[in-house]
Amino acid sequence: MKKLLLILLCLPIIGFGQQTYVPDDNFENYLEANGMGNGIANDDYVTTASINTINTLNVNNMNIASLVGIEGFIGLKYLYCGLNQLTSLDLSNNINLENLHCPENTIATIDFSNSVSIMHVNCENNQIYSLDISQNSLLGHLELKDNNLFYLNLKNGANTLLNHMRVTDNPNLTCISVDDSLWATNNWNVFQDIDPQQYFSNNCSTTGIEELSTNKKILKVTDLLGRETKQTNQPLFYIYDDGAVEKKIVIE
């Protein structure tokens, strides 16, 4: 009976004390200064209960290099994180996200595929090389100007809702997968939304992909969603130590 009572007394403490790991000092300091921390400066943690109901987060121009910990913001709808030093952005746990603004970083990999309610995305001036929005059928605004795109899949079954789409200044991007190539050509070209070498297709081929020189060190291999993988027989991105990205398929 005493053991049972002790367990019951500890449960509220355990629930209240759940922590989220936030390794970036500038990100943690912002959360601490704005009532979203655990009261302990520079310990790399914040109290989960203080962030999981936050609706809007604005960390623009905070010199942040990592947003690890953003997964604890499960109620987040609006995220503003532009003008930082982010190299990747994993929003796979932020399923309620509706608006994302992350321009002027050096983001190479990004994942908001689980954010099925997302409507507005601005990721211009980054290094994103692959993006698949096939699960984001409510998207109405997509800004990807000045990135490093090799692959872009806009085939989400609702392209007519995407009334603003811009992917200019992506010299490595040629074929863009869409629901209806004729509709896309007639609607998205009008406002010079794509580069001259880019075109829309219902079925972009994954064969005959341009291969770059491999006389350099491979840092990691990712799939089309930016996830590290060792699987073959699918389009993969090889990321090298000089910043180059090579796209190819290994058949086994």
Annotate each language-model stretch with its function.
Residues N55-V59, L79-C81, E98-C102, M119-C123, ...:
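Conserved hydrophobic beta-strand positions in leucine-rich repeat
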Residues S201-T229:
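Residue-level detector of functionally pivotal "anchor" positions at catalytic/ligand-binding pockets or at interdomain
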Residues F237-E252:
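C-terminal tail/sorting-segment detector
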